[in-house]
Design a protein with these regions (language model features):
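Structured beta-strand/loop patches that form or line metal/cofactor-binding pockets in enzymes
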Residues: 1-34, 38-45, 334-341
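Conserved, mostly hydrophobic/aromatic
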Residues: 3, 30, 101, 114, ...
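Shared catalytic-loop signature of beta/alpha-barrel
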Residues: 26, 43, 215, 221, ...
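Metal- or metallocofactor-binding catalytic centers and their adjacent structured scaffolds
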Residues: 26-112
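A cross-domain feature marking catalytic cores of carbohydrate-active enzymes
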Residues: 37, 133-135, 166-168, 198-202, ...
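Glycine-rich, aromatic-flanked loop segments that form ligand/cofactor-binding clefts
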Residues: 102-142
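Metal-dependent enolase-superfamily TIM-barrel catalytic cores that perform enediolate-based chemistry
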Residues: 127-244
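Extended hydrophobic packing segments that form well-structured cores
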Residues: 360-378
Length: 378
């Protein structure tokens, strides 16, 4: 079996303007694997479909490297891609393009072998696949955000989820000091034993700006405080870790597993974050293992992209015991998010607030190509 085509299609949700790049890798025997990549869409598409431009092997082009290759050996393909595209794809948007292709290759390999993709990653080590639901409903005043969040919390509880994350962004909580009231209200409703995460969206750029708010947050026993600073503000993370008892999480701005090394070495985080649509399924494995060596957990990022990316995160989580929660954007809370709810089905199966072990071949979802054609942009 040989790979015969590698293509990337930009899709845009007409309701939200969100975009994803749908990557397809097809073979001469009629099998196709699909993946997603989330970054600057036109740049990602250009890199995925790139051909050789450098005879020295520094930038051989993703499409050129894959055409004619045997899709069966994923480790060899990933190593080949990383080694021969490093001029453009070592990190950033270039790596996101690799991530989309990598996801498609894992989907294809599972279909080729007739097994769920996670079985090709290793033995099951994670006994529980627990989603957390992120609550973000766009810009507005703090009072609007508070009302929307509390309504969504009721839905989360009604649907049986076991963990939740609230958002304090400049566009939905304009005054960061109101974050304390937001968290207090949610914690009062869900109780102390319900895991609660808080995402600050990198809104602070130094420790001094965060100190007063974070001091007040310690009382709420947060599962994690996500992204207080950009991931390169290591000194500020150290100061915050020393001043607060709240576990810290960061990293969804990063891409390749190697990008995370300074954060891992800083010994300030309880969790790192990365996801299949940006880090790639293969490099998620590398990141999870590197984090485990430091005693750090891994929280897969899953806000962007659709069911393909969600499924890929779940498959990777099966084989790592330091992934306690998986970000999830359920259709019930975001019915108008077409890329999330309709591009690929079925949704992962939930029972008692946990994902059931995937059993279908590949990533276990089917892409609606008719919808993809309708959502595609040039």
């Amino acid at each position: 079996m040989k790979i015969t085509s590698v293509d990337a299609t930009i899709l845009r949700d007409p309701n939200s303007g969100e975009e994803t790049v749908l990557v397809s890798v097809s073979t001469d025997e009629g099998l196709t694997g699909y993946g997603e990549a989330v970054a600057r869409s036109r740049a990602v598409k250009a890199v995925v479909e790139s051909e050789a431009v450098d005879e020295g092997g520094w930038d051989s082009g993703i499409r050129t490297l894959l055409l004619g290759a045997d899709p069966a050996d994923l480790a060899v393909l990933w190593a080949r891609l990383r080694a021969n595209t490093f001029w453009s794809c070592r990190s950033g948007v270039g790596h996101v393009a690799l991530a989309g292709v990598d996801m498609a290759l894992w989907d294809l390999a599972g279909k080729l072998h007739g097994v769920p993709s996670w079985q090709l990653m290793g033995a099951r080590r994670n006994p529980r696949l627990v989603p957390y639901t992120t609550l973000y409903h766009g810009s507005g005043s703090f009072q609007e955000t508070l009302a929307r969040t509390m309504d969504a919390v009721e839905m989360v509880l009604g649907l049986g989820f076991k963990a939740v994350k609230v958002e304090s962004m400049p566009d939905n909580v304009p005054n960061p000091y109101d974050t304390v009231e937001l968290v207090s209200r949610v914690r009062d409703r869900i109780g102390l034993d319900f895991p609660l995460l808080l995402d600050m969206g990198y809104r602070w750029h130094d420790f001094d700006a965060s100190a007063l708010v974070v001091k007040e947050l310690d009382q709420f026993s947060l599962f994690a405080l996500e992204a207080p600073f950009p991931p390169d503000r290591l000194d500020d993370y150290r100061r915050l870790a020393n001043a607060s008892t709240t576990p810290l999480a960061s990293g969804d701005q990063l891409t390749a597993a190697s990008d995370y090394q300074p954060l891992l070495e800083s010994e300030t985080l309880r969790f790192v974050q990365g996801g299949a649509a940006r880090t790639g399924v293969s490099d998620m494995g590398n990141l999870a293992e590197a984090a485990a060596l430091k005693g750090i957990g891994f929280l897969p990022w899953g806000w962007g992209g659709g069911a393909l990316a969600t499924s890929a995160n779940i498959h990777r989580a099966v084989v790592h015991d330091n992934i306690p929660l998986i970000e999830y954007r359920p259709a019930e809370l975001y019915p108008d998010a077409i890329l999330r709810t309709s591009l690929a089905t079925p949704e992962p199966v939930l029972k008692d607030g946990e994902f059931l072990l995937p059993t279908a071949a590949g990533l276990g979802v089917d892409v609606d190509l008719t919808l993809a054609d309708r959502l595609r942009i040039e």
